[in-house]
Amino acid sequence: MKNFLPIVKLACLAAVAALIVSCGGGADYRNLLPADSFMTMSVNPASLMEKSGACDATCNPLLDRLKAELGKAENLSAEESEYLLSLLENPAESGLDLKKDLFMFMSMSGADINNPEVRGGLLFPVGDKSKLDALIARINEKSGTEAVTENGVSVVKIGEDTAATGVCAYNDIACMLYFQTCGGDIEAKVRGLFAQKQGESLMGDKAVAEQLARKNDVNMVLSYGAILPMMNNPMLSSMPMMDALKGMTMVGSVNFEKGRIVTEAAVSYKDKESEAKMMDFYAYVKPQTGALLRYVPAASIGAMSLGLNGEKLYSMLSAMPGYGMLMANPMVK
């Protein structure tokens, strides 16, 4: 009996651990998204292919055209052509999980907005690592590159002789194509993204995480705080609303439905102070009640109503660089 109790305890602990993992405690490929991205977009390929009718390989004009072009390729062996054809007909053979969202992200930095340092890439979820290993091995053999694996993350350097250096990095959870135009150790940067925790990534932003959890054809995230440092302009930086913009993030979605495209957008703030600053800046805009709609012709396809508080509008413009002297003119007052 004494020997039986420890076994029961271990079984209970194992059951609890399995339950925790099954409830979402496992690794999330989205945790690789850089927190400094000013623009991030997700696309659900499975949903778009289903809605476009592209899932049926037997009657897909694009697939037929790609097959025809593949047949013209002279530098491919019969076996290579057959393999590529299988990928076209069933993209899941690549090892990527195309039932989940794929992501595109971009960051910018530097003092010159006309010549910024750009970083960005694509992030894919991995469904079958053995198939992805086979695909990468074929590419390496064909291109003369090789994968360097450390701590479970394999990295292949690409485009080293071009203006933008890049890498393909992957493990059993995610595959990332990452490029940058600036100098620095790009491999170390990418390995850092694979090692970061949720709180260090873009998913650490609650509003962003909630948006990306929604089942949409396309999700978009635009972080004003990540792009404002690029605007190295004294007039822009001195505008009253700049402090509020630093804590502002816009999230939105696009869904393709029969006969229409549905879009939604919302703005979130990192704290109540940033939200209060923005609300104070736009205090010159009067809320609309819809009372003016009675004067709009019934056949109109659209209408816009805008109300302004003249005194608050004057105060706002007076605080704007370049407008202060104009607003101080007695004739303007």
Predicted regions and their residues:
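Short, flexible helical or helix-coil boundary motifs
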Residues: 12-15, 143, 197
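A conserved glycine-rich beta-strand in the N-terminal activation segment of trypsin-fold
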Residues: 155-231
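Charged, amphipathic alpha-helical scaffolding segments
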Residues: 31, 165-189, 255-282
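Structural boundary/hinge residues at secondary-structure and domain interfaces
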Residues: 23-155, 202-247, 261-333
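Sec-dependent bacterial lipoprotein signal peptides
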Residues: 1-21
